[in-house]
Swiss-Prot record:
Keywords: Ribonucleoprotein, Ribosomal protein. GO terms for biological process: post-transcriptional regulation of gene expression; translation. One of its GO terms (molecular function) is structural constituent of ribosome. Belongs to the eukaryotic ribosomal protein eS12 family. GO terms for cellular component: cytoplasm; ribonucleoprotein complex; ribosome. SUPFAM superfamilies: L30e-like (SSF55315). InterPro entries: Ribosomal_eL30-like_sf, Ribosomal_eL8/eL30/eS12/Gad45, Ribosomal_eS12, Ribosomal_eS12_CS. The lineage of its organism: Eukaryota, Discoba, Euglenozoa, Kinetoplastea, Metakinetoplastina. This is Small ribosomal subunit protein eS12. Pfam families: Ribosomal_L7Ae (PF01248).
């Protein structure tokens, strides 16, 4: 019995490992945006889809909006741009809808872990950034 208590006392909790990728200084604005979207997705802070994004922009609950340049509908782009400008919400343009969807986690995965199908996402908004990282600081400094 005495040996069991000494073994329990000898166990030291291991320090938490910091995610080096998420806390690394990004090389570009695109890398910073990818990391920020990844962290926001972890905390359930992403809003996808026209209806949800326009509602969040109108209610001023979004902190950041990302709009794809290759969006099919010009009226869609005008609406999101106008709402973001009207409510003083930062708007970031992205080249491809598929890349934006992949960063937002809108992918179908195969059993082996590879990406089977990537959906398309024309617009998303960030309601909660999650934890504060160097990428978030870099992104916010570039937007001002």
């Amino acid at each position: 019995m005495a040996e069991e208590t000494s073994l329990v006392a000898d166990k030291v909790p291991e320090p938490a490992v910091i995610d080096a990728v998420a806390d690394a200084m990004p090389d570009s604005l695109e890398d910073a945006l990818r990391i920020v979207l990844m962290k926001a997705r972890e905390t359930n802070g992403l809003i996808c889809g026209l209806s949800e994004v326009t509602r969040a922009l109108d209610r001023r609950t979004a902190h950041l909006c990302v709009l794809a340049d290759d969006c099919e509908d010009e009226e869609y782009k005008k609406l999101v741009t106008a709402l973001a400008k009207q409510n003083n919400i930062d708007l970031v343009s992205m080249d491809e809808r598929e890349k934006l969807a992949q960063w937002a986690g809108l992918t179908r995965m195969a059993a082996d872990g590879s990406v089977r199908k990537t959906l398309k996402c024309s617009c998303l908004a960030v309601r909660d950034f999650g934890e504060r990282t160097k990428a978030l600081d870099y992104l916010l400094s570039q937007l001002q």
